[in-house]
């Protein structure tokens, strides 16, 4: 059994004296584990860092075996990612989300969004927006997609500013006004890819919304808590935006 694909390194752990078990999010084969012989060598360690874009070949005698990887560099991002808290927490958060999915289950859209996130870590607001969309996609891929295109009460497709915590459906301003305190906020950029998050408050409200549904449908049923990297990422984005506005 063998295949070749491109991927992003998510994590590495020691295996024996010289080898490493490497976790890669691939384009066509999902999140995949494999052993890299000599993975702890000085030559290989810089390559096997989270965030790096790699060419990966996998081989195993049987499909159910972990198998071995042969990994070659396509682009190095890890050195840049460890320079800022936004990038460091961001790649950790993306990896934590991807580990909610079954291993070897292909998710090309998530892979492509992961690549975009890594490319935009130098813009905290853009990185936050992309990771928010990543969480919305995660809910969809896990079977808990949100319906944010029209009002659950009226069918209107404009002025959607709330989300029902019960149904996960959008609610327009007029229909939601009497129950505003019980509804989740829906910033306009979440629904319209042509719009950008205008400030940190937009991101914070959007992440509160996705966090509610991740907790309800994913973390709590699995007896899990939100990853520390999630709050770390949001705090880092907030600090970076404040610093840029002050300068």
UniProtKB/Swiss-Prot annotation:
Concerning SUPFAM superfamilies, the annotation shows: ArfGap/RecO-like zinc finger, Nucleic acid-binding proteins
Q: Name one GO cellular component term.
A: bacterial nucleoid
Keyword Glycosyltransferase listed: no
Record key words, sorted? DNA damage, DNA recombination, DNA repair
GO biological process entries: DNA recombination; double-strand break repair
What is the documented function of this protein? Involved in DNA repair and RecF pathway recombination.
Family affiliation: Belongs to the RecO family.
Q: What is the name of this protein?
A: DNA repair protein RecO
Q: Which gene encodes it?
A: recO
């Amino acid at each position: 059994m063998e295949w070749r694909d491109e991927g992003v390194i998510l994590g590495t752990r020691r295996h024996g004296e010289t080898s490493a078990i490497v976790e890669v999010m691939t384009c066509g084969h999902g999140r995949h584990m494999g052993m890299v012989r000599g993975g702890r060598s000085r030559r290989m360690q810089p390559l096997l860092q989270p965030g790096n874009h790699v060419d990966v070949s996998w081989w195993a005698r049987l499909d159910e075996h972990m198998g071995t990887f042969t990994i070659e560099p396509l682009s190095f991002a890890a050195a840049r990612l460890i320079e800022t808290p936004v990038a460091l927490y961001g790649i950790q958060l993306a990896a934590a989300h991807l580990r909610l999915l079954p291993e070897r289950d292909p998710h090309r859209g998530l892979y492509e969004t992961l690549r975009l996130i890594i490319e935009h870590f130098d813009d905290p607001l853009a990185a936050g927006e992309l990771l928010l969309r990543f969480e919305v996609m995660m809910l969809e891929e896990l079977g808990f997609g949100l319906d944010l295109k029209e009002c659950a009460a009226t069918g209107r497709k404009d002025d959607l500013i709330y989300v029902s915590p019960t149904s996960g459906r959008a609610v327009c301003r007029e229909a939601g006004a009497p129950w505003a305190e019980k509804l989740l906020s829906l910033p306009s950029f979440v629904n319209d890819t042509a719009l950008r998050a205008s400030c940190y408050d937009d991101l914070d409200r959007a992440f509160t919304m996705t966090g509610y549904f991740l907790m309800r449908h994913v973390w709590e049923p699995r007896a899990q808590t939100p990853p520390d990297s999630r709050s770390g990422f949001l705090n880092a984005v907030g600090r970076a935006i404040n610093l840029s506005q002050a300068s």
